[in-house]
Swiss-Prot record:
GO terms for molecular function: metal ion binding; threonine-type endopeptidase activity. It comes from Chromobacterium violaceum (strain ATCC 12472 / DSM 30191 / JCM 1249 / CCUG 213 / NBRC 12614 / NCIMB 9131 / NCTC 9757 / MK). GO terms for cellular component: HslUV protease complex; proteasome core complex. Na(+) binds at residues 162, 165, 168. This is ATP-dependent protease subunit HslV.
Amino acid sequence: MQQFDGTTIVSVRRGERVALGGDGQVTLGNIVIKATARKIRKLHGGKVLAGFAGGTADAFTLIERFEAKLQKHQGNLLVSAVELAKDWRTDRMLRRLEAMLIVADKDHTLIITGNGDVLEPEQGIAAIGSGGAFAQSAARALFENTDLAPEVVVKKSLEIAGDICIYTNHNHLIETLGPDDEA
């Protein structure tokens, strides 16, 4: 699973706000191919955030499938995530895709894996990718010991992961959802 070693995606939920951010580095083995990739998307009219780690083509395929599930299920994040995970696990072509997703709406944050897992993390903090453990640790420390806004926690967590993980850079894209955002 070499493809998973290439990014950091982290999400933090605090109060009525959720932020999802990722770095911009794409690597092929140990070579940086691109430094400004967009691994975070707003879906379903801006009401859902999605971020991916893993093979780029695989992740785009999964994002498209997830968006189709959102349309089919009127934006219901939980049902859409479970349906995608079921397809991912049982469909012969999808089973070969190597990627992970974090998706979030105003109420839930979920990690979706190719093993058929749909996980809702405790404390509203989720991270995936090669720098995910570093970002999650930083996010948890900041979340528990400060009152910083979720987007600030995500930014600082990505900075820390970028300082430690060679597959994570400092070109960040962070999207938010909250009561002040027009969706």
